[in-house]
């Protein structure tokens, strides 16, 4: 026989450490003797740290007794009152047990802490001494400190596994309101996050500032942690109490991979912050061009005005003097004439901040193109003198020369060419000003451009030359001008690519020269610009 008492459920006593609560653990002593009572005594080696109730007693044959072990944390000023070693304590306990034949036990409690100490001296009896009792500290304070330290994954796992499920230890918070997930994220530890997620924490629990774990990870740029949280069904919209949602954090901080993950998981691209900013506002404010581009590709609206100033993203880009961001927003359809709560357009904001390089894109380019379209040479001159860019383009690649040539404004064409405008600039479909003049039937403009050195062999993206266009329209005079100017007739017998079935870019065809041109068209299949003119450019880049 090597022992008289069996420890249940094991030799490890779990003592739960919680702020403001008694640190208490329990262990059951089972008398394994069938016929005789057993006397016991438990003593901690460091008696000031623990109180044991009962410390001694007599257990009837095959009976059990629950022992309470209370831990007294250190009471030091400025200390976190954690045990000196955890989760497994270095402290030792001695369990003495001895047979007590003939002991009369009328009421078991009457024998608690009343067993004479000399019963446990080996001089009188055979005393069994067991030092197997060990203390393991569990609870919120232990777990949060283990995660904060991050040194032992095994210890964290063991504490979580041994904790009573009713305690919900996996949702423990530290004194600052940080959950285990928040702490692991702050330590940039995806391995810890993975471990904690195995125990099914409240994945939407907020910390003291109202942020969910996903919001915290999105802000800190931890893409792997974000991916883990999303895989465990974290809400992409975050908490209603927080100022920023996950998509706002990612956009503001420039975390492209996280932004992409959130959008793939259905995050609302135009969700608002507490002050009414969208993710696009934040990306523009912080000059996160890649994030802005991704948001726009996913349908972000460019016309949303925030709550405080009533600014659109374009207002913010203009205030920052961010030329590339302005061009990006305009290319994606931002309206430049929206006014904020102070009645200012993006141009006004750029002007008051001294960002003159934005003037062309935000207003002067429009004025230049409008003047060219109308043939107003004086206005063209004033715009250029005010800083307008002569080779400025709108979002479809049109220059003022394209407009003037298409409308047949000879004086405007001549003035622009004399000022050095690019004769052979192409729009995004590959049309030059010569294509425009030829297609719209303006022989004088066509001849002038040819004489000034315009490339008569220039072809659109579909391989169509100006000569092919006028041949298909039976413009004999313009055909002669182009041929005399050096245009090759080679390949004219081939069928040119068919025209698009609808107007590209949603632009409006004017009823003047274009409708007249359509009446002159032959029945042959042809490739025509057909939609070159429009009343107001959306952007000049």
Curated annotation (Swiss-Prot):
The phenotype of cells or organisms lacking this gene is: Impaired arbuscular mycorrhiza (AM) fungi (e.g. Glomus versiforme and Gigaspora gigantea) passage across root epidermis and abolished arbuscule formation in root cortex during AM symbiosis, thus leading to aborted hyphopodia and no arbuscules. Reduced accumulation of PT4 in AM roots. Abnormal nitrogen-fixing rhizobial bacteria (e.g. Sinorhizobium meliloti) infection threads and fewer small white root nodules, but normal calcium spiking in root hairs in response to Nod factors.
What Gene3D superfamilies does the entry give? Answer: Ankyrin repeat-containing domain, Immunoglobulins
Q: Which GO terms describe its biological process?
A: arbuscular mycorrhizal association; nodulation; response to molecule of bacterial origin; response to symbiotic bacterium; response to symbiotic fungus
Q: What induces it?
A: Accumulates in roots, in a RAM1-dependent manner, during colonization by arbuscular mycorrhizal (AM) fungi (e.g. Glomus versiforme and Gigaspora gigantea). Induced in roots (including root hairs) by rhizobial bacteria (e.g. Sinorhizobium meliloti) synthesized Nod factors in a NFP, DMI1 and DMI3-dependent manner. Also observed in root nodules that arise from symbiotic associations with nitrogen-fixing Rhizobia.
Regarding tissue, the record states: Expressed in roots.
Q: Which UniProt keywords apply?
A: ANK repeat, Cell membrane, Cytoplasm, Membrane, Nucleus, Repeat
Entry GO terms, CC: cytoplasm; nucleus; periarbuscular membrane; plasma membrane
Q: Which Pfam families match?
A: Ank_2, Motile_Sperm
Can you tell which superkingdom this protein's organism belongs to? Eukaryota
Q: Which parts of the sequence belong to the MSP domain?
A: 4-138
Q: Note the topology in the membrane.
A: Peripheral membrane protein
Where found? Cytoplasm; Nucleus; Cell membrane
* SUPFAM superfamilies, per database record: Ankyrin repeat (SSF48403), PapD-like (SSF49354)
Query: In which broad location class does this protein mainly occur, judging by the first location in its UniProt entry?
Result: cytoplasm
Under the subunit heading, UniProt states:
Interacts with EX70I at the periarbuscular membrane (PAM) around the arbuscule hyphal tips.
Free-text function comment from the UniProt entry = Required for arbuscular mycorrhizal (AM) symbiosis with AM fungi (e.g. Glomus versiforme and Gigaspora gigantea) both during fungal passage across root epidermis and for arbuscule formation in cortical cells; this symbiosis promotes phosphorus (P) and copper (Cu) uptake. Essential for infection by symbiotic nitrogen-fixing rhizobial bacteria (e.g. Sinorhizobium meliloti) leading to the formation of root nodules.
PANTHER family reported for this sequence: ANKYRIN REPEAT-CONTAINING, PROTEIN HOS4
Q: What is this protein called?
A: Protein VAPYRIN
The organism of origin for this protein? Medicago truncatula
UniProt lineage = Eukaryota, Viridiplantae, Streptophyta, Embryophyta, Tracheophyta
The gene name on file is VPY
């Amino acid at each position: 026989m090597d022992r008289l008492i069996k420890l249940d459920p094991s030799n490890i006593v779990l003592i739960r450490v919680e702020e403001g609560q008694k640190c208490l653990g329990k262990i059951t002593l089972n008398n394994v003797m069938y016929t005789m009572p057993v006397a016991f005594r438990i003593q901690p080696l460091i008696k000031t740290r623990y109180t044991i109730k009962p410390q001694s007693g007599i257990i009837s044959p095959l009976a059990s007794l629950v022992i309470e072990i209370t831990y007294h944390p250190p009471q030091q000023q400025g200390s976190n009152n954690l045990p000196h070693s955890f989760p497994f304590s270095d402290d030792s306990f001695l369990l003495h047990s001895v047979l007590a034949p003939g002991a009369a036990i009328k009421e078991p409690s009457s024998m608690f802490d009343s067993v004479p100490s000399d019963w446990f001296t080996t001089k009188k009896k055979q005393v069994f001494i067991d030092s197997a009792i060990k203390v393991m500290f569990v609870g919120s304070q232990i777990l949060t400190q283990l995660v904060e330290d991050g040194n032992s994954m095994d210890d964290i796992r063991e504490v979580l596994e041994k904790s009573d499920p009713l305690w919900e230890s996996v949702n423990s918070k530290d004194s600052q309101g940080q959950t285990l997930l928040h702490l692991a994220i702050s330590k940039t530890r995806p391995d810890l996050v993975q471990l904690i997620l195995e125990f099914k924490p409240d994945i939407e629990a907020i910390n003291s500032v109202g942020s969910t774990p996903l919001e915290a990870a999105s802000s800190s740029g931890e893409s792997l942690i974000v991916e883990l949280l999303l895989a465990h069904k974290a809400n992409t919209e975050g908490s209603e109490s927080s100022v920023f949602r996950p998509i706002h954090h990612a956009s503001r901080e420039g975390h492209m991979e996280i932004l992409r993950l959130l959008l793939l998981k259905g995050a609302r691209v135009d969700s608002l912050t507490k002050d009414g900013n969208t993710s696009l506002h934040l990306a523009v404010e912080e000059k996160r061009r890649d994030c802005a581009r991704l948001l726009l590709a996913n349908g972000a609206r460019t016309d949303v005005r925030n709550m405080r100033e009533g600014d659109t993203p374009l207002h913010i880009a203009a205030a920052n003097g961010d030329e590339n961001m302005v061009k990006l927003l305009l290319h994606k359809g931002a309206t430049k004439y929206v006014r904020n709560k102070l009645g200012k357009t993006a141009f006004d904001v750029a002007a008051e901040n001294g960002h003159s390089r934005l003037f062309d894109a935000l207003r002067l380019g429009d004025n230049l193109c409008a003047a060219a379209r109308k043939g107003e040479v004086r206005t063209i001159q004033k715009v250029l003198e005010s800083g307008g860019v002569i080779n400025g383009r709108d979002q479809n690649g049109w220059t003022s020369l394209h407009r003037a040539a298409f409308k047949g404004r000879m004086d405007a064409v001549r003035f622009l060419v004399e000022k050095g405008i690019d004769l052979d600039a192409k729009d995004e479909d590959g049309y030059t000003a010569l294509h425009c003049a030829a297609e719209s039937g303006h022989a004088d403009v066509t001849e002038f451009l040819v004489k000034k050195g315009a490339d008569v062999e220039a072809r659109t993206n579909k391989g169509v030359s100006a000569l092919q266009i006028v041949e298909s329209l039976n413009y004999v005079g313009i055909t002669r001008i182009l041929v005399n100017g050096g245009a090759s007739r080679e390949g004219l017998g081939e069928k040119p690519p068919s025209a698009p079935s609808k107007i590209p870019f949603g632009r409006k065809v004017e009823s003047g020269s274009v409708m007249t041109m359509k009446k002159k068209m032959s029945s042959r299949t042809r490739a025509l610009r057909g939609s070159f003119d429009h009343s107001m450019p959306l952007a000049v880049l």
